Amino acid sequence: MKKRALIVLAALVLASCTSRKPASPPAPIEPVPPPVTVSVQPPPPATSEPVPMPPKIKTIDWQASLSPLVQQMLAVEGINDGSVLLVNTMKNTTNGSVQTGKATAALTRLITDAGGKFQVVGANQLNAARQMLGLSADDSLESRSKAVGLARYLNAQYVLYSAAAGDVKQPTLDLQLMLVQTGEIIWSGNGVAQD
């Protein structure tokens, strides 16, 4: 029995061995001829149309446009000298793009240069407060209530809310001075932006 098992095992081992086929001769290596270089002439440049000029951005003289309104606001009686004022970012409700950052900066500069009527909240302090309250510096949904809330956070007595409205070529400027404690509008003025 052991002999048979041994013979069967040997037969299986031998059957599983494959015999090698005779190796075929290696394929002959043929040299590749060098590539033929063909000089290609670049196509003549296509005549291109001139690039159209971008539309000119209408520049507004913010100093001249806002100065009369600021003078009217500074003439309001009942405001203590040195009161803290938050100049809110100008809101754009025109039919186009208005440089509200420049307008707000000009408005702040006019009030600061006017003397000691108001102590204007600085830009760094304003930006820090906006971050703390989760408001974006470029908040397109700016509202009077947000402006008053921001002013309360900064302990300002007054807020100057401003907006540019109408046609972007000559927007109407609306300014409102609000008492933070009550939200009451104590002065408002409007004018047309000048070139």
Curated annotation (Swiss-Prot):
* Covalent lipid adducts (S-diacylglycerol cysteine), residues: 17
Q: Name one GO molecular function term.
A: enzyme regulator activity
Q: Give start-end of the signal peptide.
A: 1-16
Composition-biased stretches (Pro residues):
23-51
Q: Where in the cell is it found?
A: Cell outer membrane
Gene Ontology cellular-component terms for this entry are: periplasmic side of cell outer membrane
Sites of N-palmitoyl cysteine lipid linkage?
Answer: 17
Give the residue ranges for region: Disordered. Answer: 19-51
Keyword line: Cell outer membrane, Cell shape, Lipoprotein, Membrane, Palmitate, Peptidoglycan synthesis, Signal
**Disulfide bonds listed in the record:** none
Topology relative to the lipid bilayer, per the entry, is: Lipid-anchor
InterPro entries cross-referenced by the UniProt entry:
LpoB
This molecule's function is given as: Regulator of peptidoglycan synthesis that is essential for the function of penicillin-binding protein 1B (PBP1b).
Record-stated family: Belongs to the LpoB family.
Assembly and interaction partners: Interacts with PBP1b.
Annotated NCBIfam families:
lp
HAMAP family xrefs: LpoB
Xref: PANTHER family? PENICILLIN-BINDING PROTEIN ACTIVATOR LPOB
What protein is this chain from? Penicillin-binding protein activator LpoB
